Curated annotation (Swiss-Prot):
It is a multi-pass membrane protein. GO terms for molecular function: alkane 1-monooxygenase activity; metal ion binding. The keyword RNA-binding does not apply. Belongs to the fatty acid desaturase type 1 family. AlkB subfamily. Fe cation 1 binds at H138, H142, H168, H172. This is Alkane 1-monooxygenase. Pathway: Hydrocarbon metabolism; alkane degradation. It comes from Pseudomonas putida (Arthrobacter siderocapsulatus). The gene is alkB. One of its GO terms (biological process) is lipid metabolic process. Catalyzes the hydroxylation of n-alkanes in the presence of a NADH-rubredoxin reductase and rubredoxin. Keywords: Cell inner membrane, Cell membrane, Iron, Membrane, Metal-binding, Monooxygenase, Oxidoreductase, Transmembrane, Transmembrane helix. It holds the Pfam family FA_desaturase.
Length: 402
């Protein structure tokens, strides 16, 4: 027996108390179908908006009730935990769940008599869960195995965001918490303005990265080896079939659910690194990203439906680490609630800023020069925050203004 095996065999017995609760992440995409069933059984069309109520209302309340979990798996059991097949299988099973939600919802809209209000409510509900197909693709796309990476492309095709596979792994993880990253929001930048640079910026960066990769291999960017075109083709075929089978209502239903799915990623990107900035070194490069360059959340319930996405700090420190092994660290910048509640706050900019701006300033120890700030808000922030900091911090704030 080699030394490595001995270490694994002698690892302390660890019990993941959440092990069988992770199945909530797998079944979360089925929620729109539950809404359809309830609407059909009761005759109340309001149930088509079930996911909206659960996501923006019920989950934040449950997060507040059940609180946070700061427990970590011991480092010596992480390798063994990573190899446990159960956790990976749950992510695989989530992929067909996303397809089922899309196809069943499209079938229902195409074959039933529904008001436009009901169609939009169901489209938005589907958009939330299929927006979180991006989360499933995120978990699978960081893996090294070819099967996992193809599963990521397949699930990203559900919501027509196949370029995320390239953009996130090769772009966002490289540039996060710097001015070069369109997926890092600035303090004072509202989510609506952020979306206008994040959505097109993400696609441009992904396309450029893939063009460079293929060029190095002597291939055209229009080659089918283009990993952006692969899921894009799946999306086109899938949506064309849905249109052919379920009729012209799909011309409204599919774009709405897709747009709201994209909005979920925009919301996540907006809150995950809001205002945070890596320090620029003497050679002009930015410091290596660290766990404190991401906003973290240990809220139990929302983490259980998001494959631990909210332990975002450790994810950026160890991108290939699976969800069940992600850790919390002392002193991390922390969101006041889980992602559903934070997404809701973000849609009301004054509310979000009133909660998060002081947190960002505290994160920077009052030095505004260490924060990414929206240009139009600089003067306001200098006036608002410099009276609470010392002379050294005021010099930092002055440096920001210059």
């Amino acid at each position: 027996m080699n030394g490595k095996s001995s270490v694994l065999d002698s690892a302390p017995e660890y019990v993941d108390k959440k092990k069988y609760f992770w199945i909530l992440s797998t079944f979360w995409p089925a929620t729109p179908m539950i809404g359809i069933w309830l609407a059909n059984e009761t005759g109340w069309g309001i149930f088509y908006g079930l996911v909206l109520a659960v996501w923006y209302g019920v989950l934040p309340l449950l997060d507040a009730m059940f609180g946070e979990d700061f427990n970590n798996p011991p480092e010596e059991v992480v390798e063994k935990l990573e190899k446990e097949r159960y956790y990976r299988v749950l992510t695989y099973l989530t992929v067909p769940m996303h397809y089922a939600a899309l196809i069943v919802s499209a079938w229902w809209v195409g074959t039933q008599s529904m008001s436009w209000f009901e169609i939009v409510a169901l489209a938005l509900s589907l958009g939330i869960v299929n927006g979180l197909a991006l989360n499933t693709g995120h978990e699978l796309g960081h893996k090294k195995e070819a099967f996992d990476r193809w599963m990521a492309k397949i699930v990203l095709a559900v919501v027509g965001y196949g370029h995320f596979f390239i953009e996130h792994n090769k772009g966002h993880h490289r540039d996060v918490a710097t001015p070069m990253d369109p997926a890092t929001s600035r303090m004072g930048e509202n989510i609506y303005k952020f979306s206008t640079r994040e959505i097109p910026g993400a696609f441009r960066r992904a396309w450029g990265l893939e063009e460079q990769r293929l060029s190095r291999r002597g291939q055209s960017v229009w080659s089918f080896d283009n990993e952006i075109l692969q899921p894009m083709v799946i999306t086109v075929v899938l949506y064309t079939l849905l249109l052919a089978f379920f009729g012209p209502k799909m011309l409204v239903f599919l774009p709405i659910q897709m747009a709201f799915g994209w909005w979920q990623l925009t919301s996540a990107n907006y809150i995950e690194h809001y205002g945070l900035l890596r320090e620029k070194m003497a050679d002009g490069r930015y410091e290596h990203q660290k766990p404190h360059h991401s906003w973290n959340s240990n809220h139990i319930v929302s983490n259980l439906v998001l494959f631990h996405l909210q332990r975002h700090s450790d994810h950026h420190a160890h991108p290939t680490r699976s969800y069940q092994s992600l850790r919390d660290f002392p002193g991390l910048p922390a969101l006041p609630t889980g992602y559903p509640g934070a997404f809701l706050m973000a849609m009301i900019p004054q509310w979000f800023r009133s909660v998060m701006d002081p947190k960002v300033v505290n994160w920077a120890n009052g030095d505004l020069s260490k924060i990414q700030i929206e240009d139009s808000m600089r003067a306001e922030y200098i006036k608002k925050f410099t009276h609470n900091v010392g002379a050294d911090d005021k010099r930092g704030a002055t440096a920001v203004a210059s």
